[in-house]
From Swiss-Prot:
Lineage: Viruses, Varidnaviria, Bamfordvirae, Nucleocytoviricota, Megaviricetes
SET domain sequence ranges: 23-172
E.C. numbers: 2.1.1.-
Single GO molecular function: methyltransferase activity
Protein's recorded name: Putative SET domain-containing protein L222
Alphabetic keyword roster: Methyltransferase, S-adenosyl-L-methionine, Transferase
Family recorded in the similarity comment: Belongs to the class V-like SAM-binding methyltransferase superfamily.
Top enzyme category: transferase
Gene Ontology biological process terms from the UniProt entry: methylation
Amino acid sequence: MSIDSSTSANIETLPVYSDSSNEYIQVIYQNPNIYEHEENNFKSVFTKSEIKSGQLILLEHVLVNDSTNSYLIIENNEYLFDMSHPRTDKFSECSEENRRLQAIKKLSSNCFGIDGNKLLTCAIQKINHSCTPNCAVNISEKYNFGGTHIVFMELFSINNIPANTEITISYGPVTGHKRDFECLCGKSLEEREKIFSIVCGLSRKISQLNNDLIKKYIYVYTTSDLGKKIMLNHFLATKGIYINKDKIVAITESGAETINNLVYKYMKIKESDQTNKKITSHKIKMFMTIIHACLFPEDSTDSSESVVLMREKN
């Protein structure tokens, strides 16, 4: 499903929750009747007041990637590293080796699985497991924007939830009993599978009922500067280019090839003449300037002039 301007009607009053410091994952909508609670370094989410069944609780643009790319993103991004459980040493306090080991642990503790890939969230990963949950997650993979495939997670209430009640979801009939906590539900695997199947069916049905509202939120987000930047960062990660605080901080061989190809293509240098493959700060700056000009065409005049100056210096 493509996102186009036809979904933009009556959206100017829709609140869009955003955190510009998070460069890979974004909460697009958060129900105002929930709050986050932290105790002994563990987080949970509670209701402030009653939430009726069938309500949208959270809508989140999530990060989907293979295991290697996912842990490299966490390892090289300060916000995601410090946010993810277990929160022991801070990003700035870790050696490179220790940060790599912790990133692997954080990935296993905070991700969902989808089609063999890892799915990283910011808000939904704070919600604890219950084999009889009061909320359900729907993973929406039907959107693309500018040729970029993007995945959203939707969280809905499936019961009337009283005030001051913990929000819970099911991690799955098996996974929910394998994580680093003890489930005391006492239910058999067969019972858990039956409940999980019902919950999944409810989440799909409620998502369909809320489809128009969700499309409007997604349109506002994907056409915003923040949404475009995060989609770009997702794309760069698939190429082996990793961002922290708006700067390229790590590059794989594939990433270096992507940077060289774009810069040399813009400079109209023939492949036979591309002798200098070294990634320099100057080349990275040129790469990011070209990308910015494509992503934000309204600023393209200034960006184009900057690239021209770089070409002349080169």
